[in-house]
A protein has these predicted regions:
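N-terminal secretory signal peptides that target proteins for export/translocation
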Residues: 1-2
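Extracytosolic ligand-binding ectodomains
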Residues: 5-12, 22-390
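N-terminal signal peptide c-region/cleavage motif recognized by signal peptidases
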Residues: 17-19
């Protein structure tokens, strides 16, 4: 066989393999390896892969395998838009998992609307970010909606909430929104007198001055608007200075390892969550598999977070939408199939997710149960449960 013929046959074989590859159903993914919420993002991809493996193990979608293509945003909004465009235009993804933060969603959702591709966040919770867009969805609940349940639970438990103060980071969108809008508004609605607030930067290591100011205010509760890392440092400094006020927060601090890492300094802290593994056998099975894979990857996790569960569910939502819309992955039908995924998700009712039955509201946010958790000695205890939409 001459070299030209051999080359022709190799090229022909490569081309023959292309259609099968092209029929893989591609999901884009926008993880954040840096930024104020990097610890929350670190294990989300493992959760997504569990869902992919489960779907593919039973034949995929009409015989077509699902797979994930990732682009790391490093927590930067401009890179999130670059990533979305690459995944949509170069990689021909049918839909996108993420981004994680509200700052990223602010720019990704309008970009996704222009392109015509669904992007679904597993963690963004700043109020009304998805509402103006048809392709922007969030498998999260509004922080105001969740924090109302925290305050209601505190009232029902008769925990002291007569006076409150607030500590929040000013250098990321959701922390600032929590500190300036969500926490003070809902605390006041609940009859709590807000006596003052302090601010800090996410990367600030020394929070002694802020803790001293909070000590002087001497309030029953201290609302925290930040990611997990500064919340840990603040709790430790408050207890070092002898401040006994109960810490309360939204889901922005909801790292599954938070209780273990803070230890006794966090005793009494109350936050909302949308995932509690004790809610079902399905949720427990997911967490067991998740912990096994996390350990195999050399990461330190003793439990799955609500953002891990939300990421798993996003993949399952997309699989459901692809089945219902009879998606093929055909490049010639890409725009129509992306829109069909959007329309199916928006019409979805009470999908049996890990977190409970989930639908999407008109504002693009998931309607899901809220679990109110209290920290004690390195563990989370369930103290309140609110069904979806209650």
């Amino acid at each position: 066989m001459n070299s030209k013929l051999a080359g022709f046959l190799v090229a022909s074989a490569a081309l023959a393999g292309t259609p099968a590859q092209a029929q893989d159903l591609r999901l884009g993914y926008l993880p954040s390896s840096a930024g104020p919420f990097a610890t929350l993002s670190r294990t989300n991809e493992i959760a997504a892969q569990i869902a992919i493996d489960e779907i593919n193990a039973v034949g995929g979608i009409a015989g077509r395998k699902m797979r994930i293509i990732s682009f790391d945003t490093a927590g930067k909004p401009d890179q999130a838009v670059v990533g979305l465009r690459k995944l949509a235009e170069d990689d021909k993804a049918l839909a996108v998992i993420g981004p994680l933060s509200s700052a990223e969603c602010r720019v990704v959702f309008p970009a996704g609307e222009r392109i015509g591709i669904v992007a679904m966040s597993m963690a963004s919770s700043a109020p009304k970010l998805a509402e103006p867009f048809t392709y922007g969805l969030r498998n999260t609940s509004d922080e105001g909606y969740m924090f109302q349940r925290v305050m209601k639970t505190l009232q029902e438990k008769k925990y002291p909430i007569a006076t409150g103060s607030i500590a929040y980071a000013t250098d990321d969108v959701i922390s600032k929104t929590m500190g300036e809008a969500v926490l003070p508004s809902i605390m006041k609605q609940s009859g709590t007198e807000v006596k003052g607030s302090v601010t800090f930067q996410t990367q600030a290591f020394d929070l002694a001055a802020q803790a001293s100011q909070l000590k002087a205010l001497a309030t029953d509760v201290i609302g925290v608007g930040s990611g997990p890392e500064p919340a840990i440092r603040l709790a430790q400094e408050l207890r070092r200075q002898g401040v006994s006020g109960r810490l309360i927060a939204g889901s922005t601090v909801g790292d599954s390892e938070l209780a273990r890492r803070i230890g006794a300094d966090g005793n009494g802290t109350v936050i909302p969550g949308t995932f509690y593994p004790g809610v079902s056998g399905k949720a427990q099975k997911f967490e067991e598999e998740f912990i096994k894979r996390v350990k195999a990857a050399g990461l330190e996790r003793s439990a799955a977070s609500q953002f891990d569960a939300a990421t798993y569910d996003i993949v399952q939502f997309y699989a459901y939408a692809m089945k219902e819309a009879k998606v093929t992955g055909d490049a010639a039908r890409l725009a129509d199939e992306r829109t069909a995924i959007r329309d199916t998700l928006r019409a979805m009712k009470s999908y049996p997710a890990l977190e409970g039955p989930i639908s999407f509201g008109k504002n693009g946010d998931a309607l899901k149960p809220v679990y109110v958790l209290e920290m004690q000695n390195g563990h989370w205890n369930l103290i309140g449960t609110y069904p979806a939409g209650s």
